[in-house]
């Protein structure tokens, strides 16, 4: 479903935790990271599409989040021709998005990247609100910056921009195989099996590894 200008209606989701850190998902079998997003189906409202995409990409349900705000209007980005299927070139230009800012009220272990048979992400992490966008595919960076800037007014305490040169940090969780941490590339742990907990007094999530708590 395209509008007259060739843009597909879409929703984007910025998901916050209690520390004003944002959820990033690593695209399946790729090296780029992004926020959850997806197209609005015929007959859906942006809010309905947001809740559907939230569940499909993160496993979260409406009771796990609280809507903090949304963008006033559509934000658009164009997709380079090399990423557009040949049959729709000349018609499809890109995405126009309504962005939602959500506060997670559930727990980290409510997140499940395998909620559907067609997952979008194979790892996830929390990161600073104003983290540099180097790990985001280039043609989406401007609209990400616009969405983050517009929605930052809804934060409990304004997140401060950072001049740090590093990109988004590594995924929080070590890979687990047969119950033992492995030294391979980090990936998210199956959320149906474990929760994470940070030691009291830690000032950032990077200072110590999370404790892994196996459910009975």
Swiss-Prot record:
S-S bonds: none
InterPro entries cross-referenced by the UniProt entry: Nudix_hydrolase, NUDIX_hydrolase-like_dom_sf, NUDIX_hydrolase_CS, NUDIX_hydrolase_dom, RppH
Region (Disordered): 159-180
PANTHER family named among the record's database cross-references: ADP-RIBOSE PYROPHOSPHATASE, DIHYDRONEOPTERIN TRIPHOSPHATE DIPHOSPHATASE
Pfam families the record matches: NUDIX
PROSITE patterns: NUDIX, NUDIX_BOX
Function in brief: Accelerates the degradation of transcripts by removing pyrophosphate from the 5'-end of triphosphorylated RNA, leading to a more labile monophosphorylated state that can stimulate subsequent ribonuclease cleavage.
Native species: Burkholderia thailandensis (strain ATCC 700388 / DSM 13276 / CCUG 48851 / CIP 106301 / E264)
Motif residue range(s): Nudix box: 38-59
Assigned EC number: 3.6.1.-
Keyword entries, A-Z: Hydrolase
Single GO MF annotation: pyrophosphatase activity
Protein name per UniProt: RNA pyrophosphohydrolase
Cofactor annotation: a divalent metal cation
Protein family according to the UniProt entry: Belongs to the Nudix hydrolase family. RppH subfamily.
Residue ranges of every copy of the Nudix hydrolase domain listed in the record: 6-149
